[in-house]
């Protein structure tokens, strides 16, 4: 996955469009779509927040129907969450507008909105923009990846080619309000692989748990979190095991990109847990470490304060044998049932890099899990103190 971002194109049968419709005050691109020339099998996961946005609610209803998809339309700048029945109508109208232009059914179009909560969509701008979006359809992926951003500092793309030539291209957005429970976080994958929808949907929750649900920036779960994969089958039959492994790799790549681009972040925080009683406990312990303000602050200051790892693991709910527990910082053992002698200054120096890794062995089993976060800087507070003002 080393191809320069500008050169990434969508898999065969998919095209995308992006434009500045005037939703964002900045005038940057804020309305986009991805369209398939063929029906798509799809899998979806949305936020478990009880204040889920209109787009999540509608997508969930469409997902339950089992019907195929043809398109996705996204607006950035307004979340259209906590907007009542008017917000629900506006969301449906956005889908219907694109469906009409594409001559497909409204139920074949899913929607996504991201931005400020509690604001209605400027529907005159949205509908006017959607009407012209298909005129801009192209194969390049970067314009779409850029148009879905809000506080992100960079676009996020990942891609892979399978042995039969089928491709998976994934794109995501997210920088703050990141603590998914399926923070504003979107992740979409598009593939020309032919995969059975039932098998895809059956495997998807576990993949999401190990990737996007293992990311945290600030502990706040968004009203609009969602991830979806669309498969149009244009490349023909594909080995399911190979496909699912590749899909998880793309989603893992995107998850790490989201964590690294956390609001105000200067370092990616990776916590790798082993020796857990179950994968769920391993993931829970790793994620609790990544969301700890104390550990995040230590990472920002390059402080190898491993006691904050012990604290976070202890409150995670994971089973632990302290006498068998081990902790390493940047590969240096610092705890093994008790404190170890180590060169704190050298470890601190090693933490002054793009990624800081903590390895934690819980000492109770053989399960493992990994989570990603970022450091906590003064810039995070500045960004969010001034977000709407």
From Swiss-Prot:
Recorded hits in Pfam families, A to Z, give: ArgJ
Query: Subcellular location, in the record's words?
Result: Cytoplasm
The pathway entry for this protein reads as:
Amino-acid biosynthesis; L-arginine biosynthesis; L-ornithine and N-acetyl-L-glutamate from L-glutamate and N(2)-acetyl-L-ornithine (cyclic): step 1/1; Amino-acid biosynthesis; L-arginine biosynthesis; N(2)-acetyl-L-ornithine from L-glutamate: step 1/4
Which reactions are catalysed by this chain? N(2)-acetyl-L-ornithine + L-glutamate = N-acetyl-L-glutamate + L-ornithine; L-glutamate + acetyl-CoA = N-acetyl-L-glutamate + CoA + H(+)
Q: Where is this site: Cleavage?
A: 183-184
The record, for InterPro entries, names: Arg_biosynth_ArgJ, ArgJ-like_dom_sf, ArgJ_beta_C
Where are the residues marked Involved in the stabilization of negative charge on the oxyanion by the formation of the oxyanion hole as a site?
Answer: 114-115
Q: What is its main location?
A: cytoplasm
| Keywords associated with the record | Acyltransferase, Amino-acid biosynthesis, Arginine biosynthesis, Autocatalytic cleavage, Cytoplasm, Multifunctional enzyme, Transferase
- From what superkingdom does this record's organism come? Bacteria
Single Gene Ontology BP term?
L-arginine biosynthetic process
* Metal-binding in keyword set: no
Q: Active site: which residues?
A: 184
Q: Give yes or no: UniProt keyword Isomerase.
A: no
Binding positions for substrate? 150, 173, 184, 263, 384, 389
Which CDD domains did the record assign? OAT (cd02152)
- Its Enzyme Commission number(s) read 2.3.1.35, 2.3.1.1
Gene3D superfamilies, per the entry: ArgJ beta chain, C-terminal domain, L-amino peptidase D-ALA esterase/amidase
Provide a GO CC annotation, any one. Answer: cytoplasm
- Note the PANTHER family from the entry: ARGININE BIOSYNTHESIS BIFUNCTIONAL PROTEIN ARGJ, ARGININE BIOSYNTHESIS BIFUNCTIONAL PROTEIN ARGJ, MITOCHONDRIAL
Protein family membership: Belongs to the ArgJ family.
Q: How does it assemble?
A: Heterotetramer of two alpha and two beta chains.
Note the NCBIfam families from the entry: ArgJ, PRK05388.1
Q: What is this protein called?
A: Arginine biosynthesis bifunctional protein ArgJ
Source organism of this protein record: Deinococcus radiodurans (strain ATCC 13939 / DSM 20539 / JCM 16871 / CCUG 27074 / LMG 4051 / NBRC 15346 / NCIMB 9279 / VKM B-1422 / R1)
